[in-house]
Amino acid sequence: LPALKEHAADLNRINEGVSKAVNEKMKSERFKTELITNVSHDIKTPLTSIINYVDLLEKEEIPNENAKEYLEVLERQSARLKKLIEDLIEASKASSGSLSVNLEKLEAGVFLVQTVGEFKEKTEKNELDLQIKKPEEPIYIMADGRHFWRVIDNLMNNICKYAQPKTRVYINLEQSGEKVQITFRNTSSYPLNISSEELMERFVRGDSSRNTEGNGLGLSIAGSLMELMHGKMQLFVDGDLFKVILEFDRCEVS
């Protein structure tokens, strides 16, 4: 089947991507060891699924409807592996500072509302009540639009995956002196028996989160991107309460 050839090609690209992510821009042997150990767990589930469904497709006399269903599973699991590799490569580049940065003046409130708004369908599906609070007057920051979008995107994906359904998610934009802070606060679906420092480490997630399809790279990438934009990201954990604060220097209105 042509589709199987495509998935075989996907697996080859995945292997190449893993090798590149591990060997390129990563000087810490400890980091490489942790990366291999933890990512192998995330790769195992979709890879096992792909192998099993390929085996089923190789059997004779498979009804077309079943074959279609198997191919859909293969496509979905291949997409998971592709996303993992993309995140690995971005994490490597972000942590090494090799990503290009184009700082420009952005209106934080408008940018925040627009980006968070892209998650309307996901938050409604997870029965999350978004509460966004921001000043009426514009607040400007210096940031890279593409990287800033990715930071918010990663945080919102994290919220959609791990927040307790039927709870409120608070997002607050405020200016404090020469600083601008954006705070994300939500209730986790399980107790966070881990320190905020450990949460910022790549691939460290609570055992309960292994039931989701995340790869644990989102927070690490967001933190590295904030540093590249001369900003700061802080995490706070208290039981099942999870809070992230993004901090930028305030940009003068000209």
Residue locations for each model-derived region?
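Short helix-loop "hinge" at the ATP-lid/N-box region of the Bergerat-fold HATPase_c
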Residues: I159-C160
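Short alpha-helical segment of the dimerization/phosphotransfer core of two-component systems
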Residues: R76-L81
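Conserved micro-motifs of the catalytic ATP-binding
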Residues: S96-V101, Y140-A143
